[in-house]
Amino acid sequence: MSVPAELIEGLKARYGEPQRRYHTWDHIEALKRHFDGLADEWHRPEPVLWALYWHDAIYDPTRPDNEELSAQLLEEDGRGHLGAEDLAFAAQIIRATAKHEVPDGLSDDDRADLALFLDIDLSILGAREQVFDQYEADVRAEYAFVPEDAFRAGRAKVLKSFAERPAIYFTEEGRARWDAQARRNLARSLAQLED
């Protein structure tokens, strides 16, 4: 189970684009460490791995359709490397990152994989305080074109949407690993944004 080296090199170039501060190859490597650490949990690891590599491949903070464009890029790049069913599932995972919600109509195994992927993608919310603060600074840098007041209001809305969820994470694994720290980080960040 691997992604061809020439595709990885193309992705690294994308993740190195100048508008990125958080959504870089470092983010992908962090998720890959979580993916590897949870190796026994995945039912369909290959499409999950491909989704992991491509989920932020297209990233333009001025556009609302990055996830869709990333899924389409995966569908192009993955053709001939993944079977049709795996490719469709990998693209579905990427599309689910737009709202960080698990869609209906999945098998139990696919639902579990997609939920766990969304959890590792949001693991940054439950990172150590210093790591989370750097994440917040990096997100602000990616949206440097947005005036401060508008950014603060928009960012507070996004963070509140997670903080107000009964469970930020979908899986027991995610809740055990990251929920408590995520709630502390979100509360602290929201207090700063609303100050």
Model-derived features with residue positions:
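Acidic/polar low-complexity segments with low predicted structural confidence
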Residues: 1-2
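His-Asp-centered metal-binding catalytic motifs of divalent-metal-dependent phosphohydrolases/nucleases
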Residues: 31, 45-61, 70, 91-98
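Divalent metal-dependent phosphate-bond-processing catalytic cores, especially two-metal-ion Mg2+/Mn2+ enzymes
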Residues: 16-23, 29, 33-44, 54, ...
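Short gly/ser-rich anion-binding loops that grip negatively charged ligand groups
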Residues: 21, 60, 64, 80
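Hydrophobic (often cysteine-bearing) scaffold residues that line and stabilize catalytic clefts
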Residues: 27, 66-70
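Histidine- and acidic-residue-rich, metal-dependent catalytic cores
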Residues: 14, 70-104
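Short, well-structured alpha-helical segments
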Residues: 5-12, 25, 29, 49, ...
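Short, flexible active-site-proximal loops enriched in glycine and acidic residues
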Residues: 43-46, 64-66, 82-86
